[in-house]
Amino acid sequence: QSENILGYFFNVERIPNSCSDSPNRIFLKDRKILLNISTAYYRVNISAYNEAGESPQALYIVPEFSATDLPGQIHVKHQGTNAVVTWTPEFNPKCFVVDWGTGKEDMHMKIITTATGNFMLDNFQPYKLYKIMVHASDVCQCESFIRHEKTFGVTRFYFMEGVPRTGPTNVTILNITKHSALVKWNEIAVEDRLGFLRGYRISYIDSARKKSLAVTLNSSTTSYHLTGLKEKTIYRVQISGFTGAGEGPLTLSQPFSTPKYGTV
């Protein structure tokens, strides 16, 4: 029963935990705790206890932090099958801790004790978005970094970019008039981009197979106002996304028809 709870066990574990430390276990009387942690991934387990024993644990993954106000800039470039990460230290900790991977289930960790400001990483695959984090720490032995590390910088990186595997989804045509229409779409999902999405290209084809000039839009745009359409004409819109590697497949809208009469 909740009224018989004597306290809580709170375990926090860094991901990845390459030192194979047991999680930090904290005993709490209250149902809140303030942690000063880095932007690394953390796994939290919480259980309650009373005179009869301990409850099952509730598992929680600390969500990703915004990395807009970090002090350092990280740069990544290819070198053969590896990537070289460089940064300019603004202070001199005893070591840097580097995390890299595609997500919390696929993170690697390395402790760097030299003050060179660069490091070579491996284990990269093409067409996958990697997150690279550099943390400064005054503790460099194989022990918990939770109380000691501060994030210096975070960046995202594709070892090799590809073209998007799909086009935008849910392309819809709204507000159709004699000479205009509004096109809306859902952005290409991150896992389908296979590279940094640079933008979209949109054009339309009429019933005579006459194609308009393509308009290039930035990657944050998810709507476009078509103008210069002919009245009483059937059109289809086509949209594709593109990365640094090129343009992906087209998504075609359902046909729509402009009216003969009505507003312009």
Located regions from the model:
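Extracellular low-complexity, O-glycosylation-prone stalks/linkers
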Residues: Q1-V264
